[in-house]
């Protein structure tokens, strides 16, 4: 739906160029249902991850700090999801006021940037820990990790400011309903292009290239170590995991990014056909479901590969309190890529297998 704005009242009155685009009865049922499932699984899962990492693992590793913040970022988004489920179920009628319109929209944007930035930092941390285990010890400290997370939250907040400023409620005259959307001046294309392309570039393309490069270099390093030892009985799970992480990230986010770019073209009136607009508006909520279902699974995807996490997760389920005496043993095996190869395998850098630990 492409809005045209007509007055300067408290609640702006708009005219939608393609009023029926994206408005299908099955969307009003399917999307809220999926949102509800994501909300339940995400709140439950990410809350458990936060409790296990903070209370049982005690933030003893750099990776644990990134994973904790990743779970917190997802929780920030998830608490706004019931609003979007209700909004869709009510056929895009927004009854929650202008303030919640801004905050809920900012929550989506904030989670996008915070999660992607944290995943990028986690991939860089894995690269440093595995490829440069000795040189990176000085840089990979708990203090640096905490400062990095603070910077990421600030950057995500700054990136979300345009959403807070320009997202408002409007009354769509030809739809006879109040909607939550962006207001674009007809002659100002900078904001339209900027918001869309920043999501494409900063929220996907650049982080993905960094993640892909990091895990590719990790894969080459581990492969070289195996080739030197000629160990035919090696375990290739680490290679499969690296490939899975990259492809899972890419294929979960690429649909939403493509349709975001098409939406920019619609806002710029490069695409004016209402049939194409209907396709974009119809597909957009489903691409959001795919993207954020991936985000909610990220903590599980990374953490459940850690041996210690499974133990503490079971303790939490059985209401067994954390054992303080076990804390010193938690400095390793935190993240999904903290990998310890067989003892007879050494990296070409002449470091022992212990250099694969997460510290």
Curated annotation (Swiss-Prot):
Family, per the entry?
A: Belongs to the G-protein coupled receptor 1 family.
Tell me the compartments it is located in.
Cell membrane
Q: Which PANTHER family does the entry link to?
A: CELL ADHESION MOLECULE, TYPE-1 ANGIOTENSIN II RECEPTOR A
- From the Swiss-Prot or TrEMBL record, give the protein name: Type-1 angiotensin II receptor
The intrachain disulfides are: 18-274, 101-180
Q: Cite the entry's keywords alphabetically.
A: Cell membrane, Disulfide bond, G-protein coupled receptor, Glycoprotein, Membrane, Receptor, Transducer, Transmembrane, Transmembrane helix
GO annotations under biological process? Answer: calcium-mediated signaling; immune response; maintenance of blood vessel diameter homeostasis by renin-angiotensin; neutrophil chemotaxis; positive regulation of cytosolic calcium ion concentration; regulation of vasoconstriction
């Amino acid at each position: 739906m492409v809005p045209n704005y007509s007055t300067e009242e408290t609640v702006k009155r708009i005219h939608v160029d393609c009023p029926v685009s994206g408005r299908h009865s099955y969307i009003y049922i399917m999307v809220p249902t999926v949102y509800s499932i994501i909300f339940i699984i995400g709140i439950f899962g990410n809350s458990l991850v936060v409790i296990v990492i903070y209370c049982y693992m005690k933030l003893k590793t750099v990776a644990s700090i990134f994973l904790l913040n990743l779970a917190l970022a997802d929780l920030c988004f998830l608490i706004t999801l019931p609003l979007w489920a209700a909004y869709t179920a009510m056929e895009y009628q927004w009854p929650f006021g202008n303030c919640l319109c801004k905050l809920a929209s900012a929550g989506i944007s904030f989670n996008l940037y915070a999660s992607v930035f944290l995943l990028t930092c986690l991939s860089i941390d894995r690269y440093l820990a595995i490829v440069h285990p000795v040189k990176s010890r000085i840089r990979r400290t708990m203090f640096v990790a905490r400062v990095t997370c603070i910077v990421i939250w600030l950057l995500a907040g700054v990136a979300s400011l345009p959403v807070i400023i320009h997202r408002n409620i409007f009354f769509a005259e030809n739809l006879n309903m109040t909607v939550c959307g962006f207001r674009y001046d007809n002659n100002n294309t900078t904001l339209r292009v900027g918001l869309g392309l920043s999501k494409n570039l900063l929220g996907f393309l650049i982080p993905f290239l960094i993640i892909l490069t990091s895990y590719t270099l990790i894969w080459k390093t581990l492969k070289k170590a195996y080739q030197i030892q000629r160990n035919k009985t090696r375990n290739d799970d680490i290679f499969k995991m690296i490939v899975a992480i990259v492809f899972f990230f890419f294929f979960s986010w690429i649909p939403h990014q493509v349709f975001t770019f098409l939406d920019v073209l619609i806002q710029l009136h490069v695409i004016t056909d209402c049939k194409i607009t209907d396709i974009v508006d119809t597909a957009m909520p489903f691409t959001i479901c795919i993207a954020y279902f991936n985000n909610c699974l990220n903590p599980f995807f990374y953490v459940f590969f850690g041996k210690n996490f499974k133990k503490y997760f079971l303790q939490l389920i059985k209401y067994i309190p954390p054992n303080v005496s076990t804390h010193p043993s938690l400095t390793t095996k935190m993240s999904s890529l903290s990998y310890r190869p067989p003892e007879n395998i050494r990296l070409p850098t002449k470091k022992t297998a212990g250099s694969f630990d997460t510290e």
